[in-house]
Amino acid sequence: MPNAPAGGSAVQSFEISSMVRRAAANSYLCCPAEVLEILLAAGRLSNVKPTDDESADALAEAGLQLLRRAQDLDITEWALSIRTQPSLHDVPIDSRIHAGSAHRVAGALYILQAVPYVRALVPPDTRMALEDQLFHHLASVPDQDPNFKATTWPGFIAGAEASDPERQAWVRHRLQRTVRLVPWGFIYTALDTLDIIWGLRREGKTQEGWVQTLKDPDMNFLIV
């Protein structure tokens, strides 16, 4: 069973949570703070290596609880909370809901990749349904919308999940348009990483999931 954090780890987790929430409260480009907290927890679970069936079941259950937590997030409430910031009153709420929902759904997909044991506990069509939702939310935030720049990470997850060449091309073009608006270096890295993931998928090397594949020491790849 995944170990409970020691005292120092608990304090560190609290400090990280507080920092994340402060950042989210002061920037409309942030995804919902709770999504970031869920991703942090999922990343930690992805490093757990079960030693027997009991520990594998416990890991799957822990991942499932994270998945449910992500799916239960009230994105509308989060989107409306920006009205407490006078400088951000003009941010469109409808597209903010879609951007926040894209992060929530992308977080759920990340959990299924980072903790593959969870997949046995959800319906077989869960990933495809989440992928469809993610593309819907992304398509609802057009280039000219101020929330467009906030969809880079869920856009990357959409590309990583996509096996359909048309969807892959759609994500590539979206990220290329994003980088022309805001030439952030990590977007170039995201595009390069997607090429790697798609290439590995064509070779049949991502059965365990793209997160776990990229975490393989032989890949010499850093996953944050």
Q: PLM features: residue spans?
A:
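Cytosolic regulatory protein-protein interaction regions
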Residues: N3-T152, I157-R180
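Intrinsically disordered, low-complexity regulatory regions with latent secondary structure
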Residues: L175-V224
